[in-house]
Amino acid sequence: MNKKYLLLFVCGLLLSFTNAMAAVGNGVIKIKTNASKGQKIKMEMFIFGGWDEDGDALDNSPVYGDNFSVDGASNVTAAGNKVVMTADGPEITIHGDVDYLSIVGQGVTYIDVSKATELYELRVNENPITSIDLSNAPRLKVFWASNCKELATVSLENTPKLTGISLQGTQITALDLRNNPNLTSLNVGENQNLSSIDVTKLPALEELWVNGNGMEKLDVSKNTKLERLECSKNNLADLDVANNEKIEFLSCWGNKISGNSMDKLIASLVKETEGTEREFCVYNKLYDKEKNALTVAQAKAVKERGWTPKQATGTMDFFTWQAFDGDDATGINTATISHAADNVWYDLSGRRVAKPTQRGIYIHGGKKVVIR
């Protein structure tokens, strides 16, 4: 082959490569996993296909070798939006304009989406990843990394289009949301190291989960579009929802709200006049750290505002909510009283007393007893 034909051959190869890359797209996603060589990796994805007449993104199913390719893995197959591949090593690189990626429980330890310019939804739940930097994902709208038990840091610096975040059950200690004004759904529950969070810069927020975090304060005064608030299993001694007129579901059981603080919370509930069902899940006797207390009079006040006060029934592993008429002795969790000593009496403060002779309500044999 002379030099002229060799040059033409090389040019042809380069042109073919360039055309192939153009078809695949310019986006790049780099992933590291703890998968051993030969282990299957499963994920779901869609490829950006342009815009429709309404300005919404078009999703195309992935076609290997056509609109996406992979380095670091073999035996790649795609069916619908599901993709399966065999890892050749710990590092996998996906080429293509991926706009939706869900890789759940696949041993992901690292992911780089800084060059995934079309990515709008990322789900990496249940992976041993320790940190995620999304500061170069300006198109991202939805991000889930729930039950990533080792995840400690998340950077959201340049993600102004985010509307949904789920970071339930991680190790994060802080989350800066100042640059995410479009958030409508935020789930940061079951994060024992996240003792506080500022949601005052989230005017569009409609759903908020902060349950099980040990929080002592929660300010939702700026979240005027809030419809659902789950703040159970914290250390809240008070709560004010006066500015949340759209709220329809409030779950605040497992806190320390009682007496005057409960009166103030009830007074802050929007008064329902048009028949909208509004639930006030306030008490869970199955929870051994329950310190909320709702009296009969307070339950009546809740109903007068058009809400339904509710308590949990079932077991802590699986419980449902039922209407609650209040209990003037909700300060005692009878499930924690020993049944072994039938001659032992307690007052409603949980103090052991002699067999009572005065009128009142006492705890005896694990049951509430009224002495008249």
Predicted regions and their residues:
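C-terminal tail/sorting-segment detector
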Residues: 3-5, 361-372
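Canonical leucine-rich repeat
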Residues: 111, 132, 143, 153-154, ...
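Residue-level detector of functionally pivotal "anchor" positions at catalytic/ligand-binding pockets or at interdomain
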Residues: 123, 325-349
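N-terminal capping/linker segments that flank leucine-rich repeat
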Residues: 2-121, 138, 149, 158-160, ...
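Consensus "Asn ladder" position of solenoid repeat domains
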Residues: 106, 127, 148, 170, ...
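Conserved hydrophobic beta-strand positions in leucine-rich repeat
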Residues: 101, 122-124, 143-145, 154, ...
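Short hydrophobic/aromatic-rich beta-strand motifs
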Residues: 265, 345, 361-364
